[in-house]
């Protein structure tokens, strides 16, 4: 095991321990590590759905989660900000050629260029 990630079982507790308050999140203050909070939220949702947590790295590329769903291995990229482009997801797709990829963000449902877009509020749909 070369590296690992740790997640807290409760995003509220994580926010409190990190000293983040709701005002900072609502205002979109850049000093708040919103990406880590969002990724942690998705991790807890995946665990609740029974998925073991795996991720993928290669060089400077990292895909947040890799799950097995209906005998398919699917990469999941989590985006907390408006920019949903992911070079790492593209690297993974070029290397492994999954049937499709999943992007979880604040954007609506959609499917474009082999990427299934799922809004954060609907992670339970996985």
Which residues does each predicted region cover?
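Accessory nucleic acid-recognition modules appended to NTPase machines
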Residues: 1-67
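Short hydrophobic-aromatic micro-motifs
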Residues: 6-9, 76, 117
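A broadly conserved detector of short glycine/acidic/proline-rich loop/turn motifs that flank catalytic sites
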Residues: 12-13, 59, 71, 80, ...
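C-terminal helix of von Willebrand factor
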Residues: 120-126
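Catalytic cores of nucleic-acid endonucleases
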Residues: 80-120
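Short catalytic-loop micro-motif centered on adjacent basic/acidic residues
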Residues: 54-55, 75-78
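Short, surface-exposed beta-strand-loop junctions and turns on beta-sheet-rich folds
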Residues: 23, 73, 82-83
């Amino acid at each position: 095991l070369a590296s690992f990630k740790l997640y807290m079982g409760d995003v509220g507790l994580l926010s409190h321990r990190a000293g983040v308050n709701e005002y900072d999140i609502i205002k979109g203050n850049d000093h708040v590590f919103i990406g880590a909070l969002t990724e942690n939220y998705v991790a807890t949702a995946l665990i609740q759905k029974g998925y073991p947590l795996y991720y993928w790295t290669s060089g400077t590329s990292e895909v947040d989660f890799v799950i097995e769903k209906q005998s398919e291995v699917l990469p999941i990229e989590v985006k907390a900000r408006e920019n949903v482009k992911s070079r790492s997801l593209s690297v993974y797709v070029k290397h492994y050629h999954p049937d499709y990829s999943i992007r979880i963000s604040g954007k609506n449902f959609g499917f474009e260029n082999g990427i299934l877009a799922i809004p954060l509020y609907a992670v339970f749909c996985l």
